[in-house]
Each structure stands twice: as C-alpha cells, then as structure tokens.
Amino acid sequence: MARRRKGRPINGVILLDKPTGISSNDALQKVKRIFFAEKAGHTGALDPLATGMLPICLGEATKFSQFLLDSDKRYRVIAKLGERTDTSDSDGEVVETRPVDVNLEKLEACIDTFRGESDQVPSMFSALKYQGKPLYEYARKGIEVPRESRKITVYEIILHRFEGDEVEMEVHCSKGTYIRTIVDDLGEMLGCGAHVTMLRRTGVAKYPYEKMVTLEQLNELLEQAHRDEVAPKELLDPLLLPMDTAVEDLPEVNLKAELTNLVQHGMPVQVLGAPEGTPIRMTSGEDKLFIGVAEVNDDGKVAPKRLVVFRDEE
C-alpha cells in the first residue's frame, strides 16, 4: 500500500517577513502548517533577533532554493557602540564595555574598509558546522573551534545615522556574509567594541520588498477562510510567487513539445545556441512553462539537472 503523503503538493515561493524572537526553522514550520504544504524549505537562515525577508520555497520550488542561498542580500542594521557581546548581538551577554570616542570622520573611514572583497571569519554563534555540529552548539559550551575564513563581497555599505552610541547602516552583500561579524569587527577598529541591536533583511536576489507577508497576515487569511467556509488555499495560494522566480536570473532555453518530453525523461537534447558554463532555466512551449534547470554537458547538449515534477492535488 502506498504511503499517504502528509500535506498537499503546492508549489511556489512565499516571501515571509520573519518576526523577531523566533528561529528561521520555527518560521518555516509555521508557514508549512498554514499552507498545509507537503514540502517546505527556507533559503538562508536569519538569526532569531533578525526580522525581514525570508523566502520560503514550497513543494517543487525547494529543488531550486540553492540559487536563492547563493544570491545577494540586503540588510538594515543598528549597532550599539561601547559594548561587545559574546554573540555580537543583543541576545548575548556583554563581555566588554569601553568608552566611545568616535567622530564621524573616523567612523566613515572605518566603514569604508569593509567595501569590496575580503576574508571574513564566521562568528562562533553561527549555523555553520564543524565535525557535523553547528558552531553555536560549541559556543554555548564555551568551546572555541577553528573556522576557515570565507571570501565575501560588500557591494555597498551606507551610513544612514550616527547618534551618540548608535550607528545605523545599510549593507548590500554577497552570500555568506555575517552582518554581526562586520559590526563586531567595526567596533574593534573603532576601539570601543560594538554589537547588533536591530537587524532587518530587506532584500534577497531581486524579490520585491512590498511582496513580503507576515505570519499574522497568513493566520488572518486562514481564519477568514474558516469564517467564510471556503478552502484556505483560495485565499492563501494567490500570495505565492512562481517557483521559477528563484532562478529568474539564469539564461533561458525554450523547448518545443518533443524536446520537452525527452528532457522530462532525463535525456540530454541538442539546442542551438544554448549558453555554456552556466545553469540554464528551461521553459516549454509558447506559454514558457518552467520545467527545470539544466547545464550544457561535454557533448554540447542541454542536460537536465533538476526537473519539476507536476502532480495534481488528490
């Protein structure tokens, strides 16, 4: 007897405005339950303290979440000068207090050093793993383990406000950039220490800020559906963005029906002018139905790598 799946095969991306105080995984599970989705995955964790854009992939969209993990991010951050914490944010314990002797000129000069490419050593309080365990598990036990530095790029860092011991900045950066680490490093450069008191992710890839929805809004729609005696999906599903928005920056190859059929059975196909050396977004027919991601193989053919499996709700 076939195992009955729990949840429905709904596909798409919801742009959640994550609230402060909960983990990204907790937020993911709440969204999964609200949509009664069979599968769900987020696209890069936010700290419990942080709020803002957390794209959550549902169903077949989870196959393409890696492309969002690898995408650029934008943040708004407020830092408090004069105090350093063990987590580099206000959720941690203050480990050092120093007087703040910083003027605008010195602050701007220090901020300028973060622009461009650099090597960043991740915080011990991060989800990166060492010998199979997240770093934060070691950190909570007071154990320091070696971490390799990673190449990051800060495309833009803008100082919006400097008042007393508070600094507010906007950062546009590459994947894997820890804003807490930037703030901690900035505090050390200034000689007074610093930690994050507010962090909000305002952008992931090219997703529009105004498309974000809160857990409260989703729960209200769920309650409204129950009051109106309609299926929750009638009110919730229109909020979903198409799953190919996760790969919209990839070059497109449009396939006719015959080639589509071959690709959907895992067969490489010959496509004139297909771009090499990059993942390819495959669409089918005049409607340009998204069917998956491919790469050009050594034979010069478009070889499917991740395919969308289309299933109807039971």
UniProtKB/Swiss-Prot annotation:
It is an enzyme of class 5 (isomerase). One of its GO terms (molecular function) is tRNA pseudouridine(55) synthase activity. It comes from the Bacteria. SUPFAM superfamilies: Pseudouridine synthase (SSF55120), PUA domain-like (SSF88697). The keyword tRNA processing applies. Gene3D superfamilies: Pseudouridine synthase, PUA domain. The active site is at residue 47. The keyword Chaperone does not apply. It catalyses: uridine(55) in tRNA = pseudouridine(55) in tRNA. Keywords: Isomerase, tRNA processing. GO terms for biological process: mRNA pseudouridine synthesis; tRNA pseudouridine synthesis. Its EC number is 5.4.99.25. Transmembrane segments: none annotated. Belongs to the pseudouridine synthase TruB family. Type 1 subfamily. Responsible for synthesis of pseudouridine from uracil-55 in the psi GC loop of transfer RNAs. This is tRNA pseudouridine synthase B. It comes from Vibrio campbellii (strain ATCC BAA-1116). The lineage of its organism: Bacteria, Pseudomonadati, Pseudomonadota, Gammaproteobacteria, Vibrionales.
